[in-house]
Regions:
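Phosphate/diphosphate ligand-binding glycine-rich loop within oxidoreductases
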Residues: 35, 39-144, 269
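Positively charged, low-complexity intrinsically disordered leader regions
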Residues: 1-59, 63
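Adenosine-phosphate binding glycine-rich loop
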Residues: 258-259, 265-308
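Phosphate-coordination loops involved in phosphoryl transfer and adenosine-cofactor binding
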Residues: 41-46, 151-153, 258
């Protein structure tokens, strides 16, 4: 039966739905490379709202919608001030009369939740200060491609616990992983998300304050910037707290011999990761970036299928 579904969080979809969507992403990637990408969004118009600067998210989403046969309109805060000049509810109601789906990249997670509550069309979260679910689907897709499986892969996230870390914890609540978080005592992940993983009982979750201990035998070393967009005033403080969690050659050598390095980008070379490692043979950051395109195609295609 047709239904309006959203993608605001990894937790919005079941384990089976997430796995099936990754399989769909692999299929769409293959067909796209063969020049046969199915036009799942043909005749559909999608609107994207950006309150944060973007390279990968904007380009990958616009190309994804185009490859699926749809039309996309991209808007910024300069076009309208949601929550100020117009209420979130009014924006949701009006855009639902024009568009077949809404994608949003913004600061406040509550704004996205409110938008989804009032929208009559699917809403896809492209990033908030709280989480980054589309990034995690691209990450999961990349790991699946490289290792042939996702379940029980040993992943170590190093550095500042942020929206990406939160989405890793969500994924570990849906799919069995050996997830290790290496961070300072001052930059821990939210307790309720740690408890969520523990209550789900699917994954092994460990938190370390020593990077060398955390990366023993891991298959994926993952990092992100130490200060997110809008947190530049915290850069010096974070450098002092997190300098021991940099991914460098010495740390990489402590991990599994076949381990790979991931970074969701943009990166600060010589801060959270050295140029030697990021540009080295075990780095898969550009494969990971490409998979934003294919993962988002699968997400949008699935939201459209549920509507029909």
């Amino acid at each position: 039966m047709p239904q309006k579904r959203d993608f605001i969080s990894i937790m919005d979809w079941s384990s089976e739905e997430l796995i099936n969507n990754l399989e769909l992403a692999l299929e769409l990637k293959k067909k796209t490379r063969e020049g046969q990408c199915p036009k799942e969004l043909e005749g559909r118009s999608y609107g994207m709202i950006f309150h944060k600067d973007s390279l990968r998210t904007r380009v990958s989403c616009e190309v994804a919608i185009f490859q699926l046969g749809g039309h996309v309109l991209t808007m910024s805060e300069k076009d309208f001030q949601m929550g100020k000049r117009e209420s979130v509810k009014d924006v949701a109601k009006v855009l639902s009369r024009y568009l077949d789906g809404i994608l949003i990249r913004t600061f406040s997670h509550q704004v996205v939740l409110e938008l989804a509550e009032h929208a009559e069309v699917p809403v896809c979260n492209l990033l908030t200060d709280f989480n980054h679910p589309c990034q995690l689907m691209a990450d999961a897709l990349t790991i699946l491609e490289k290792f042939g499986r996702l379940e029980n892969i040993k992943v170590c996230y190093l550095g500042d616990c942020n929206n990406v870390t939160n989405s890793w914890l969500n994924l570990a609540s849906r799919i069995p992983l050996d997830l290790r978080i290496a961070t300072s005592k001052e930059t821990l992940p939210p307790e309720h998300l740690v408890k969520q993983v523990q209550d789900a009982g699917l994954s092994k979750l460990s938190i370390y304050h020593e990077a060398a201990e955390a990366v023993q035998d891991v298959q994926v070393l993952y990092t992100d910037v130490w200060a997110s967009m809008g947190e530049k005033e915290k850069t010096k403080e974070r450098e002092q707290l997190l300098f021991g969690f940099q991914i460098n050659r010495d740390l990489l050598n402590l991990s599994s011999p076949d381990s790979l390095v991931m970074h969701c980008l943009p990166a600060n070379r010589e801060r959270e990761i050295t140029a030697e490692v990021m540009d080295g043979p075990r780095s898969i950051v550009y494969d990971q970036a490409e998979n934003r395109l294919h993962a988002q195609k699968a997400i949008l295609a699935q939201l459209e299928r549920w509507r029909n």
